[in-house]
Regions:
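Short helix/loop capping segments that flank catalytic or ligand/cofactor-binding pockets
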Residues: 103-106, 136, 197-200, 289-290, ...
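Conserved catalytic network of the ASCE P-loop NTPase/AAA+ motor domain
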Residues: 19, 83-88, 117-119, 179-182, ...
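Flexible glycine-/small-residue-rich
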Residues: 97, 128, 190-193, 282, ...
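Switch/communication elements of ASCE P-loop NTPase nucleotide-binding domains
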Residues: 1-47, 273-275, 279-401, 478, ...
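Extended helical coiled-coil dimerization/tether regions that scaffold
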Residues: 195-316
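Extreme N-terminal "head/tail" segments of very large remodeling/mechanoenzyme assemblies
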Residues: 1-26, 30, 42-85, 92-100
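Glycine-rich phosphate-binding loops of NTPases
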Residues: 57-211, 218-223, 485
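Acidic, divalent-metal-binding catalytic cores of TOPRIM
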Residues: 361-569
Length: 569
């Protein structure tokens, strides 16, 4: 089974948010998009693991600011109590489970069923709200007494001490028992893990101790206690130890009559005390002596192995930014390990990964990718797998730049990319916010389709397509349709066959190009033929001439490129 949907209300940045998940989901988005908040929200209705602890009682800073503002505004405006109560800032996290695979999983979630059994929908919810709505509203009114402007209020003054939480079944409101909830665990490998094994009192010791204690069978614990007793016997047999507890020979009779024979026996400590003295070594060095990236790799490996091995009905493993501090090779190893582990994890393992790395994204099926944008969770679709296959052929293609950059220009090849980057650098405008990406092919339809899934109708996001005509009107019309139907897409095609033809034909460029290459071409067609003979090398020379600040008459851009760049201003 797995968690299919999560609904969040009034938790941190989420005013009203819903996301659909799969057994393996990769979540991407810009900074502050809410990836960490999503993982934290999931921990509220679910059981924490043995390694980390997630508090379920929230603070006022965890409540959505907009919800608090709306509540305050209703009081200031003198709304009726019923309307004010409806606006009380309440945090709700509702989780839907589906697809139980065996009687154990059905036994755990069966009582949470919603609607018809055929739908296989089982829900529980976490609520953080005032215990007494009337008393809460009265307290809030007293707090805002005399205030007439919302700007005079303070969100952190909300009487949070009147709140309480509970985890209930969505179908009948009954509390979820701990015995059921303990079989559904959320396990988080968060992004802030730099202190793992950073010194000789490292966090790795604590984690390893907890892992061992929770995993040891009773028979193993008995063996450890027995071994500890044997270890103590060896200590007791040392000469120094004997001297401490053996009386002076001159007083043997005194001790025989008054004091029983003194012996030392082990004060058997609990397992935590014994196991906490174990530390990790890698090669010939302590783990804390290894590099930060290596420690992060070990951290992910240890925890993910431990989490997926838990004998629960569901293990939800959340991994934040697995790429943190990892080299190219180690990141490849980590992504392979996570991906293959999820494939073999069975129905009890569900994995959520957040990432900023194209290498992690390209490793997985595109249909597993979810883009967080505002209060939306957008699932990428690739029905014909055109983009998935493209990413498999170009594993280093940065799809994040395509999807998340505010201004993106897609071009066919490196020649256009060199030319445009040179112009941008010379003009020094839009350079920091404009991404120029070469797709190394002629068709842009697939890229525009996936870009629109995330950015359709968003005026702050712009995409320009710069393409060659190639004497193909049908293909030109297919691309131009996207320009016509979308205000934030601009498609521009060469007038003639390719870029070189249009560049040579641009007013004044024939003279400029003849001067640059020391040629005497009489027509643009003749110059275009020359440029095509060694495209990359000659475009590089053109780009260098544009970058030369001493050149007061640089090559001019052709009309289709200039219009595509003007659209970005």
């Amino acid at each position: 089974m797995y968690i299919r949907t999560v609904e969040i209300e009034n938790y941190r940045a989420f005013k009203s948010f819903k996301i659909k998940l799969s057994p393996l989901s990769l979540i991407i988005g810009e900074n502050e998009a809410g990836k960490t908040n999503l993982f934290d929200a999931l921990a509220l209705p679910l059981n924490s693991n043995d390694i980390s602890f997630n508090k379920k009682r929230l603070s006022v800073s965890d409540i959505n600011r907009e919800a608090i503002k709306d509540f305050y505004q209703a009081i200031i405006n003198g709304k009726g109590d019923d309307e004010i109560k409806a606006l009380i800032p309440k945090v709700r996290v509702e989780v839907e489970f589906t697809d139980p695979k065996n009687f154990i999983e059905e036994g755990v979630i069966g009582k949470w069923i919603i609607g018809e059994e055929a739908d296989e929908s089982y829900k529980i919810r976490y609520d953080f709200r005032p215990k007494d709505a009337d008393h809460f509203v009265k307290s809030a009114k007293e707090l805002l007494d005399g205030i007439e402007d919302i700007k005079e209020t303070r969100w952190f003054n909300l009487p949070i001490e009147l709140y309480d939480y509970d985890v209930t079944q969505s179908n009948n409101g009954l509390k979820v028992s701990y015995s059921d909830l303990r079989l559904i665990a959320i396990n988080s490998i968060n992004a802030e893990r730099d202190d793992f094994a950073e010194n000789n009192t490292q966090k790795s010791n604590n984690i390893l101790t907890k892992m061992l204690i929770s995993a040891l069978e009773d028979s193993d614990k008995a063996k450890i206690n027995s071994a500890y007793t044997s270890f103590f016997d060896e200590i007791e047999s040392t000469e120094t130890f004997k001297k401490i507890v053996t009386p002076d020979p001159d007083f043997e009779n005194f001790f025989d009559e008054i004091v029983d024979k003194l012996e030392c026996i082990p004060n058997l400590p609990n397992l935590k005390s014994i196991l906490s003295n174990i530390t990790l070594k890698s090669g010939e060095s302590y783990l804390y002596q290894r590099g930060l990236g290596y420690r992060n790799l070990v951290f992910i490996y240890l925890l993910f192995e431990f989490f997926k091995g838990n004998k629960n009905a569901l293990n939800l493993c959340c991994i934040e930014e697995p790429e943190a501090h990892l080299s190219v090779n180690n990141l490849r190893f980590a992504t392979d390990f996570i991906y293959k582990s999820t494939q073999k994890g069975g129905s009890s393992l569900q994995t959520l990964i957040s990432s900023h790395s194209p290498q992690v994204i390209n490793k997985l099926e595109l249909t597993n990718v979810i883009v967080l944008s505002g209060n939306e969770a957008i699932h990428l679709t690739d029905s014909k797998k055109h983009l998935t296959n493209y990413l498999r052929k170009r594993p280093n293609f940065d799809i994040l730049k395509l999807l998340l950059s505010n201004k993106t220009v897609l071009v066919e090849g490196t020649t256009e990319e060199m030319l445009i980057n040179a112009i941008l650098y010379r003009n020094n405008k839009n350079l920091s916010s404009l991404e120029v990406i070469s797709i190394e092919q002629t068709g842009f339809i697939t890229f525009m389709d996936v870009w629109l899934q995330v950015n359709k109708g968003k005026p702050k996001k712009k995409l320009s397509i710069i393409r060659d005509y190639d004497d193909n009107n049908a293909t030109k019309d297919k691309h131009q349709k996207y320009d016509i139907e979308n205000d934030n897409i601009r498609v521009r095609t060469t007038t003639q066959y390719t870029l070189e033809d249009d560049l040579a034909g641009t007013a004044g460029n024939l003279h400029r190009l003849n001067t640059l290459f020391n040629k005497k071409c009489k027509t643009p067609e003749e110059m275009a033929k020359f440029l095509k003979n060694s495209k990359a090398e000659r475009m590089l020379k053109i780009a260098d001439s544009i970058l030369d600040e001493m050149n007061k008459d640089p090559i001019m851009l052709s009309k289709h490129i200039q219009e595509a760049l003007d659209f970005m201003k």
